[in-house]
Amino acid sequence: MLVVIILVACYYLNAPRQDREQARSYTETVTSTNGRKISFEMAAIASGTFVMGSPKSEPGSKNDERPQHEVQVEPFYLCTTETTIELFLVYYQETTSTITEVTGDEQNSDDIDAITGPTPVYGDMTMGYPDKHPAMGMTWHNAKTFCEWLSKKTGRTYRLPTEAEWEYACRAGGGDIFCCGNDPNQLVDFAWYEADADGETHEVAQKKPNTWGLYDMPGNVREWVEDFYDPQGYSGDSGKGATVDSPKPADGKVHVARGGDFDSSAEELRSAARAFEEEWWRFGDPQIPKSRWWLPQMDCIGFRVARSIDSDSKIVKEQKHARK
C-alpha cells in the first residue's frame, strides 16, 4: 500500500504543470450601489507553450506577426465574454469625474477608494446598444482604470490579458489559422464579422465558444491587451526557445488590440492578427486636447478582463471547459 501511495505521489509531482494546474472556473458577481447584481464567468486557462505569430505562407499574414516564436504562458483566468455595457455602466456611474478633462483637474470618486474615473463621455457611451452588448469606445487607459475599479470592487486583482495570453487563449491549444480551424467558412459559427454582423455589435456569447469555452474571441469588438505595439517586437524572441510571457515592449506610444471586430474581414480574424491604436481612432472626439478616456466613434473597440492564478483565488465553480 505504501508503495502505491509513493508511486501516485511521484506521478503527481512529475506530471506536466498544465495537468496539475487545472484550476476551476468561477463566477464573479458585482453589486452596484443601487443593489443590482451583475455576474460574469472567468475561465481557468492552464499553463502551456505555444507558437505565437504566423508563417509567411498563411493567407493574410503580416510582417509584424513574424517571426513565429514559442512562448510559455503561466496559468491565468480569462473572462469568457467581452466586458458588457451593463457592467461598464456600473463602473462609469460609480467613478466618473464631474470636472471636465480639458481643465486637467479631475475629481476623485469616493465610492471606490477614490479611483479617478473617466470624464463624461461626448455623446452616448452605449451608442444605442443594449446592456448585453460589449462595452465599446473606451481608450486603453479607460479599460485599465476599469480593471483597477473591478479589483477594488471585488477584492481580486483584475487586469488586461497580455498579447501572448490573448493569442494562446484564442488558439485554445491548436495551431490553426482561426480559432475554429483553417476554413474561413466556419467563422460564421464563431464570430460576428463582415459576413454576418450587419455592421454592428451583437449580444455577447451568442455564437459558439472555442474549445476552451471563450466566446467572441474573434469578431464583435476588437479587444485591448496589456502590451504596447512594436512592429518588430517578435524579432527579439526568435531562436531562443520558449520565452516566458511578459508584456512587450516595456514602453511605447500605442497599444495592441486583438481579435478583429464586426466589420472585419476573415483575414483580420486570424488568431495571429494584430491591430494597434491609430491617430484616426480619435477623430470623433471634438475636445482639444483629445480625451484620454474615450474614442467616441469607435464602436468596434472593447476588452475582456484577465486575472493571474494565485493564492487569493476565490473559486466557486468547477472548471467547465476541458482541454480537447
Q: How should each PLM-predicted stretch be described?
A:
Residues 40, 156-157, 209-212:
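Short loop/turn microsegments at loop-to-beta-strand junctions
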Residues 1-9:
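Hydrophobic membrane-insertion alpha-helices, especially the h-region
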Residues 37-52:
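Mature N-terminal segment immediately following signal peptide/propeptide cleavage
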Residues 184-187:
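Short, surface-exposed glycine/acidic/tryptophan-bearing loops
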Residues 15-35, 315:
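N-terminal pre-domain segments of enzymes
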Residues 52-59, 72-181, 226-234, 307-324:
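Active-site microenvironments of metalloenzymes and redox enzymes
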Residues 58-71, 174-175, 197-200, 218-324:
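Surface-exposed recognition segments
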Residues 189-218, 246-247:
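Short, well-ordered junction/capping motifs at the entry into regular secondary structure
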